A protein has these predicted regions:
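Short, charged amphipathic recognition helices of the HTH superfamily
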Residues: 2-12
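Short phosphate-engaging motifs
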Residues: 4, 125-126, 192
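Short, solvent-exposed positions on alpha-helices
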Residues: 6, 23, 117, 195-198
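RNase H-like nuclease fold core
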Residues: 11, 15-120, 124, 128, ...
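Short acidic (Asp/Glu) and glycine-rich catalytic loops that position anionic groups and cofactors
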Residues: 83, 143, 161, 205-213
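Conserved beta-strand -> loop -> alpha-helix junction used to position metal-binding or nucleic-acid-contacting
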Residues: 117-124, 129-167
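Acidic/histidine-rich catalytic cores and adjacent linkers
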Residues: 171-221
């Protein structure tokens, strides 16, 4: 990600009071890179029950020494045996639906034929990118992301009460019950925070996919 072996050597000396030459670091890198390449291209199981897709953003130095933001895209899957496996890590300048389309295509090329449920954030076009490669996959938008995005538009003095009311929606026992609770939240807060309520209604079908499953699976999702 743009950090030279010499810079890494200085970092070890500064942070850990340990001398590690640039040549040694280069030799370690040369040994590790083939293993990383093999891991990234390894064949995967044909079917995964659930996959979580998200990005973590970091500040790194580019080739010119400038501090830039890079995203590491992570795909964590649960196979038919219930085993969790990190299927891939992908680096990009930013998170976008087009890049996720490339990620989905890579998974397909490595042997994945079906994903039952994909859990993702609310990025526009994300579900379409997934279903263009895996058309039968159910896409569940991340409720935590939705809550975080919602609370940004709620006044600080109302946030605690609003979150309590919102919990009756995503914590309901069924989709019908959740919709009834959303109507009540709308009646109470809709005039004050119409953008928030509209966001929940616009994303409703994707936010409530998990209601069709048992409580144990809902908790896992």
């Amino acid at each position: 990600l743009g950090t030279s072996t010499r810079d890494i050597s200085k970092y070890f000396e500064r942070e850990f009071n340990t001398t590690l030459s640039a040549e040694t670091i280069s030799a370690i890198t040369d040994r590790v890179l083939p293993e990383i390449t093999a891991w990234k291209s390894r064949m995967l199981d044909p079917v995964y029950a659930i996959c979580w897709l998200d990005a973590i953003h970091y500040k790194v130095k580019d080739d010119k020494g400038r501090a830039v933001t890079r995203a590491i895209y992570n795909v964590l899957g649960v196979n038919k045996s219930g085993h969790k496996d990190l299927l891939g890590m992908y680096i990009s300048e930013s998170e976008g639906a087009n890049f996720w389309l490339d990620v989905m295509t890579d998974l397909q090329n490595r042997g994945v034929r079906d994903i039952l449920i994909c859990c993702v954030d609310g990025l526009k076009g994300f579900p379409d990118a997934i279903q263009s490669v895996f058309p039968e996959t159910s896409v569940q938008l991340c409720v935590v992301h939705q809550i975080r995005n919602s609370i940004k538009y709620v006044g600080s003095k109302h946030q605690k009460e609003f979150l309590k009311d919102l919990k009756t929606v995503y914590g309901a026992v069924s989709k019908d019950s959740a919709l009834a609770q959303l109507d009540m939240v709308d009646e109470k807060w809709g005039e004050m925070y119409p953008i928030v309520i509209k966001s929940w209604r616009d994303n409703w079908e994707r936010l409530t996919e998990y209601f069709q499953y048992t409580p144990a699976i809902r908790k896992l999702i």
